[in-house]
Each structure stands twice: as C-alpha cells, then as structure tokens.
From Swiss-Prot:
<keyword id="KW-1015">Disulfide bond</keyword>
<dbReference type="GO" id="GO:2000280">
    <property type="term" value="P:regulation of root development"/>
</dbReference>
<feature type="binding site">
    <location>
        <position position="109"/>
    </location>
    <ligand>
        <name>Mn(2+)</name>
    </ligand>
</feature>
<feature type="domain" description="Cupin type-1">
    <location>
        <begin position="61"/>
        <end position="209"/>
    </location>
</feature>
<feature type="binding site">
    <location>
        <position position="155"/>
    </location>
    <ligand>
        <name>Mn(2+)</name>
    </ligand>
</feature>
<keyword id="KW-0479">Metal-binding</keyword>
<dbReference type="GO" id="GO:0009506">
    <property type="term" value="C:plasmodesma"/>
</dbReference>
<feature type="glycosylation site" description="N-linked (GlcNAc...) asparagine">
    <location>
        <position position="52"/>
    </location>
</feature>
<feature type="disulfide bond">
    <location>
        <begin position="34"/>
        <end position="49"/>
    </location>
</feature>
<feature type="binding site">
    <location>
        <position position="111"/>
    </location>
    <ligand>
        <name>Mn(2+)</name>
    </ligand>
</feature>
<keyword id="KW-0732">Signal</keyword>
<dbReference type="GO" id="GO:0048046">
    <property type="term" value="C:apoplast"/>
</dbReference>
<comment type="similarity">
    <text>Belongs to the germin family.</text>
</comment>
<feature type="binding site">
    <location>
        <position position="116"/>
    </location>
    <ligand>
        <name>Mn(2+)</name>
    </ligand>
</feature>
<feature type="glycosylation site" description="N-linked (GlcNAc...) asparagine">
    <location>
        <position position="76"/>
    </location>
</feature>
<dbReference type="InterPro" id="IPR019780">
    <property type="entry name" value="Germin_Mn-BS"/>
</dbReference>
<dbReference type="GO" id="GO:0030145">
    <property type="term" value="F:manganese ion binding"/>
</dbReference>
Amino acid sequence: MARVQLWVAAACAVVLALAAPSLAGDPDMLQDVCVADLASPVKLNGFPCKANVTADDFFFAGLKNPGNTNNPAGSNVTAANVQSFPGVNTLGVSMARIDYAPGGQNPPHTHPRATEIIFVLEGVLEVGFITTANKLFTKTVTAGEVFVFPRGLVHFQQNRGHGPAAVIAAFNSQLQGTQAIAATLFAAAPPVPSDVLAKAFRVDVPQVDAIKAKFK
C-alpha cells in the first residue's frame, strides 16, 4: 500500500511540474511567428494568425514620443500590446510607455495576466504595490532605475518631481489586462449598487454617489 501511495505521489509531482510552465504566463507558441489578424471575426484565447506577414508587423514606433497627460490623472499610457502591435501575438511579451505630468499619477490598478517591470526614463516617481496581506512596498525611483510589480497585485506610480516623468514598462503577456481600482468600482456599467460600496468603504450612500459623479 505504501509503495502504491509513493508512486501516486510521484506521478502527481511530475504532472504538477509539467503543468507549471503553462500556468506561468501566456501559452507557449507553436510556430515561429503568428502576427495577429485583428480584423478576423474568429475570437480565440488570443488572436488568429494573418496570412501575409512583413517586417513592418514586427515594428512599432509608438513609444518614442511622450503621451498627452492633460487629463484628471495627469498621466498617459501608450500601449505596445497585441492590439496595437500585432507582431507580439503568441510571443508572451508587450510594452508600454507611461508619461506623467508634474503631480500626475498612474492610479492604483492591477494587471491580472502579467508581472510588470518599469525602467525610469526621466523624473522622480514614488512607486509601490500592496500584497494580499495589505502590506505596502514603496520606493522612490529616478532616471535609469528599475522597479517590478508582481502579477495581479494592486500598484501605482506617483510623480514626486517638479517636472514631467516617464517610464518604459514591460510585461510577460501580449495583453496584460488593466483594471483600475477606482474606475472599476465607481464607473462600472451597469453600476455597482451604491449601498454595496457604502458598506464596503464605511461611508454614506450620498458620499458614494458624489464619487460616482466624478467619473461621469
């Protein structure tokens, strides 16, 4: 009996070891290239491959210029993911440029499908993430420095300098997904019931409604 249990345990360990890589990020590619056909009506867990591929499919110039930060958050995210850069389809990577006005922030958010690592191009940023145990890890970073945000954890960046700031972000997914906490809760469609949010945040319903109004 003990011998059988040992073999069962060993078999389970092998299965888990083989399955682990597939759980780490996007699925492995099965061909050299598969440039996304964004116009295809076929919707898979990803995008189908387009028939005619050129070198331009693997080129993206969108990160070289600053984005427009004239908005309430004072920041702009320029994405180089599969939706704007079809050549990364099936490759399990993507990038973004984030620009911040003085005092601007990339509000608290999560990426459910990817870890994020940033390289600071210019400026002074306070960055941080919060674990599932509600512990905050925060750091002030400047040009040339790097910080990493673990997959799925709430994180943010705040410009603490007197001038603009910018970073280049990289992700281990072709489409990392972004869920901004405030917009998710206060600008959902259909809306999250105000009494639900009032109880969660321990405030009154009119206060919740006032916050919701700011997102309209």
